């Protein structure tokens, strides 16, 4: 799965969870050893993406890591305001 597919996967997972899908942004920073994907959503949607006790965020992170296994680079995923 390519980097762009990882970004598309994140958007696909997060879109049904938020009230402001137009404010979803996935920023990719890539180095020789890792791919860092940072998710930004509307301020009022942050809690929905994180979920109770971080369960939703953990599930998204697990899906992204599983999809990124084919890459030779380490995948890092963060949610920020």
Curated annotation (Swiss-Prot):
SUPFAM superfamilies: Prokaryotic type KH domain (KH-domain type II). Forms a complex with KhpB. It is found in: Cytoplasm. Residues 34-81 form the KH domain. Belongs to the KhpA RNA-binding protein family. A probable RNA chaperone. Forms a complex with KhpB which binds to cellular RNA and controls its expression. Plays a role in peptidoglycan (PG) homeostasis and cell length regulation. PANTHER family: RNA-BINDING PROTEIN KHPA, UPF0109 PROTEIN SCO5592. GO terms for biological process: cell wall organization; peptidoglycan biosynthetic process; regulation of cell shape. One of its GO terms (molecular function) is RNA binding. It holds the Pfam family KH_KhpA-B. This is RNA-binding protein KhpA. HAMAP family: KhpA (MF_00088). Gene3D superfamilies: 3.30.300.20. The keyword Cytoplasm applies. It comes from the Bacteria. Its main location: cytoplasm. Keywords: Cell shape, Cell wall biogenesis/degradation, Chaperone, Cytoplasm, RNA-binding. GO terms for cellular component: cytoplasm.
């Amino acid at each position: 799965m390519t980097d762009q597919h990882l970004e598309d996967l994140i958007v696909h997972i997060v879109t049904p969870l938020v009230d402001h899908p137009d404010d979803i942004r996935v920023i990719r920073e890539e180095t020789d050893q890792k791919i860092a994907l940072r998710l930004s959503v509307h301020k009022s949607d942050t809690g929905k993406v994180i979920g109770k006790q971080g369960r939703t965020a953990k599930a998204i992170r697990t899906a992204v890591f599983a999809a990124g296994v084919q890459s030779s680079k380490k995948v890092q995923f963060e949610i920020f305001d």
